[in-house]
Amino acid sequence: MSEPVGRAVLIAGPTASGKSGLALALAEKLGGEIVNADSMQLYREMRVLTARPSEEEEARVPHHLYGVTAASAPLSAGRWAVLAAEKMREIAARGRLPVVVGGTGLYFRALIEGLAPIPAIPDDVRAAVRAEVGDAGPHAHALLAEADPALAATIRPSDLQRIARGIEVARATGRPLSAWQQIPPEPLVSGTFAKIMLMPDRAWLQARCDRRFDLMLEEGALEEAAAMTALGLDPALPAAKALGLRPLMRHLAGEITLEEAAAAGKAETRAYAKRQETWLRTQMIAWKGFSTQHSESLNAEILSFIDDLGLTRS
């Protein structure tokens, strides 16, 4: 059952679109606290590689759910939504405004629309399935097709993470994930929400992706990649797929030059931003889109939108 949080600002958008800067500006203006809705910024080992707010920015207003889990311990969308809902209620109880920001659309969906009530998967089942899927490689999709044909029809053979999820749910619960997904979900929170989606010009966004990757290299991305390499993570883990991480690891292994790694990292980031744009436009059509770049004029436009909804403080 959803619990009311009164009012909140939700900010979505592709990577490098200026979400974090906007969230900080709004939180300072409206007496808010920021809640992270970016799946990669949950990991404590990758502040630079995931473009988490800096320590200086985090000191300006309270930030929640940043760097809260290890790269080896990913959080599901459902688990994140539970944590985010708790933070939103705590923030509202203090008389402040929750500002939830990130580019992981599924997280927002889990929070305000709900997800299927799938039981927790035992660790031994999860570990066994992940090992089996890893060993099967390109044949893993066939394993899913046996366990859940309907789900298999919607998943690419290369998406081992989702393949493993489908298999583990079927084995642990005796019911296919596709069947669980037919159960009407319940949102975790309710209230008056300003749903903001940043969609800047694509050429501007792609140039910003490139500049941001260069800045990451200056701020220590290579050192973070070295630390991640030392962890010896399973490459199937979500954290191992952080944008630019694999090219930098290849450079550290002597396989490619730093220039080649940077070019590959930038290409990954641009491609991901494009996929995010497509997903957000098609899956979050009820959100208010803002197509201009982050600026003072955009802030004023968004503040007007928030004020029209009655969310600004008196």
Curated annotation (Swiss-Prot):
Protein origin, superkingdom: Bacteria
State what this protein does: Catalyzes the transfer of a dimethylallyl group onto the adenine at position 37 in tRNAs that read codons beginning with uridine, leading to the formation of N6-(dimethylallyl)adenosine (i(6)A).
Which example biological process does GO assign this protein?
tRNA modification
Q: Where is this region: Interaction with substrate tRNA?
A: 38-41, 161-165
UniProt entry tagged with the keyword Transcription: no
Q: What is its EC number?
A: 2.5.1.75
Lineage of source species? Bacteria, Pseudomonadati, Pseudomonadota, Alphaproteobacteria, Hyphomicrobiales
What catalytic reaction does the record list?
Answer: adenosine(37) in tRNA + dimethylallyl diphosphate = N(6)-dimethylallyladenosine(37) in tRNA + diphosphate
HAMAP family per the UniProt record, alphabetical = IPP_trans
Do you know which InterPro entries this protein is assigned to? Dimethylallyltransferase, IPT, P-loop_NTPase
Cofactor(s) this protein requires:
Mg(2+)
Task: Please give the family membership noted in the entry.
Answer: Belongs to the IPP transferase family.
Q: Which UniProt keywords apply?
A: ATP-binding, Magnesium, Nucleotide-binding, Transferase, tRNA processing
Q: Does the keyword Transit peptide apply?
A: no
What is the name of the protein in this document?
A: tRNA dimethylallyltransferase
One Pfam match, given by its short name, reads IPPT
Positions that bind ATP: G13, P14, T15, A16, S17, G18, K19, S20
Q: Name one GO molecular function term.
A: ATP binding
**Subunit-structure text:** Monomer.
